[in-house]
Structure formats: structure tokens, C-alpha cells
Amino acid sequence: MCIRTDLQLKFAGKTNGANGDIACDQYHKYRDDVQLMVDTGLEAYRFSISWSRLIPNGRGPVNPKGLQYYNNLINELISNGIQPHVTLHHSDLPQALEDEYGGWLNRNIVRDFTAYADVCFRKFGDRVLHWTTMNEGNVFAVGGYNNGSLPPQHCSLPFGVNCTRGNSSTEPYLASHNILLAHTSAARLYKEKYQDKQHGFIGINLLAFWFIPLTNKTEDAIATQRAKDFLIGWYADPLVYGDYPDVMKKIAGSRLPAFANLESNQVKGSFDFLGLNYYFGLYIKDNSSKLSMEVRDFFTDMAIEVSVSRDESEVPYCFSYCADFPKNISVGEFPIVPSALQELLQYFKQAYGNPPIYIHENGQQTQRNSSLEDEKRVNSLHGHTGALLDALRNGSNARGYFQWAFLDVLELLDGYESSYGLYYIDLDDPDFKKATKAFCSLPRTTQSSADPKPHQKKKDKTGIGPSLKENLRVSGKAALIAIQCAAPDRAVLFSFIKPSPTIPGLD
């Protein structure tokens, strides 16, 4: 059992009783799913290993059935020429460790996470070349320890919803600090013990909205940079520079843990790539008056107001917590703002030295009963892959793009109410029949039989593998060529992108 299970039980009434016991049933249908990838002409699949499925008590004996499942899945992918991309943690800490010492709030988690990662590297690293330690560490820390909206549901009033335990002023910073230390420890282990033999790469993932000033006022511009520092710099600054942003240290003060000198040196550069989950841009308005509050949480420390457009008559975006959680943050479709993705990549180029980046998630939320024609999702996919091409023209070191999600699956916050999938799952059918949506009409390419398999391709000098510019020969449009799954029951489309050689600026 993991901490996600407890969350699903608590929110069952708000998700029509949905749980993840079966979801899209990839555990039993992995061969069918891999065949669907083959039929679609895809090249890579990213999935999470469930820590509690592999090591039920968090440490100690390995579950042979869990080990066999992941070996079966990886082998099935490899035998079909499909790259496995693996994430080690997706909000699914074993409940035993949460109960024993408080999970991510305790430094013991660094030791146990590293031991778990060691098992994964040892058992699967001969075939898995791409490792992501943590999915959305920033969101997990805030949702799990500030709002109570994600496992393990820690929060304190007035900053969360239905708070029964936790401290929203301190715990998000403490949990996030331990996440960074655990990532650093696992990455160091991989680089020292496995990388030379297995020739793989390791990184970490975070959520990254693009923030835009609501007005031309100086205070809104300052607030926008503050929002970037709190959400993005919280992780990117230590990973690139070895310490937290100055504005975070000034505002959070002693509530923000400090890195020891050795820790700072070790976290700095502890990645081969960064994974970004991007969905849309947000407009930022300054609200520095929040900083006068005697007790603050992560969001009052940010001291901003957030909206999805410059129309102030619209309901503000629920960036922190909502009275009717999770319903009112899961309604309607995301605004399609492809240019914001381009701006985000440009920001990483300028602020963080242009590190190798994978867009690990990007997608369109629709209601589950929406049309299979799925025009909004098609428009979103075209727009965002086009923006990625523009970012490449401007020198971005982006390496790949993942579309959330491949299948309609259980969403952690609203069960099966939302539909992100490129393929529809009939949950009323006992066999979970799949139906294609309009995305299948998009142009796409597959490798010819003469091309090398993905895991045989030569790595480029950056050590990440073929760059977007080098990977395909496509005439000006995105090539949809691979699949990602960010949890055992979830999958998303992954596409490497390369424009036609005739397009200027991408020689």
C-alpha cells in the first residue's frame, strides 16, 4: 500500500467512488498496450515503478511478483524496439515509511529512497537508459504538505482543506529539501556505480507554469519573477547553482532549510537532464500585503494573485487550495498558449545555462464525455509542438516532448471525470475497450526497418542521445513516435521533433 491509496479512499466521494485498483489495467494488459504502441508506430514508453509494488515495506525484501511484472514490461518494450523511460517516484511513497517516520519529512527517507533506487538500477539498468528520480517534486511538496490536496494530505488551517495534521508554514520546505537530497543521493549512486557500465542518464522532473505579468506595473513584474523563483527556482537553482533563490531565503527565512557546504556541492549539477511538466501560462498580480501576515504558507510567501487571462472579471485560477477541492480546479479545458512553452524554454536557456530538457507532460483536459473528435486536443498538440520547433530555432536544448496522456486513466484529483487521453477507454466495458480519438488523423512517421532500434542509437556529445534536431526527417511537422506512462496505470504520447532540413535556422 502507498500513500496514494489513502488519498483515493478519502476523496472517493468526490470522484464518484473511483480508485486506482484497476484503472486502465496495464498490469494485466501490458502486452496489448505495447502492441498498440507498435501499431501506432511509437518508439518509447515512460512509466513509473511503484516503490510499494517492488518493495512493499519501503525497504527490505523485494516482491518477486512486482519484479517479474516490471521485467516483463521492460522486456516486452525492448523486444518491440521501444525505449523504456522510468520514473522512480510519482506521489506513491510506501505507506509503511510514512507511518514509521513521517516519510519525506524525515532524513531517513534519503537512505531508503537511495536503497530503492539501487534495486531499480541493479535489476533494470541493463535495459533502462533514462531514469527520472521524482515526478513534480515541487507539486508533491506543496500539494502533499501545504494544501493537503495530494498524498500524504498534510496541511494546517487556514491554508488547506480538511486539515487534520501538518504545518503548512514549514513542511512544504522541509519535504522538498529532503526530496532534493534524495535525488542527489540516488543520482550520485547511479553516476558512481552504474553509469559507466549501463551508459544511461538520470534527471528530475518539476511542474513549470509560465508566468506573465498581469499589467505593465513594476510591482507585477517583480511579483512574476518571484513566482518563477518560488515554483521553478526552488528546484532549478539548487540543481544548477547549489542553493535556493535569494528571494526564497529572504521571505521564508529559517523555515527554508539550508544546504551544508557538501550538500550544496553535491546537489549542484546532479542531473543529466531536467523534465518539465507544462500545461499553460498564468498571469501574475502582485499582492505583497500577504507578506505582513504573521503566519504564512508557501503561497502567501509567494505574495501573488493568479489568473488564466488578463480579464479580471474571470474567476481567479485556484493555484493554492479551493473550498470545493478538487472539483473546481478540474473543470473545462486548459487555455491553449503555445507561446508560453517557447518562453519557458527560453527562460531555462537564459537563467540556467540551457540544460538538456524533456517536456515530460503537456496536454489538454476535457470532460470524459466529450467528443472523440477531440478538436481542442489536436489544436493543443499542433500548437505546442510548433512552439517547441520555434524554441529549437532559438537555440533551446530541448530533447523531447511528452503528451499527457496516451490513455484515459484515473486522475489523482478527480478520478475519471477528466479525459486527457489520446485513446478513449470504455470503463463500462469489462474488457476496457480502447477507441481512437481524432489525434490519430495527425501526420506521423515511424522508423523504417533499416533504421537502428532506439536503444542502439548513437549518443551525441552531450550524453543524452540524439537531439531533437537530429532524430527524425520530417517535413515541418511534429512526428508522433513514442509513448510515456507516468504511473503504472497511465500513459502519454512522446514525440521527438525535427523539422524539414529546408527550414531556416535549424541546420
Which residues make up each language-model segment?
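Catalytic domains of carbohydrate-active enzymes, especially glycoside hydrolases
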Residues: 29-50, 351
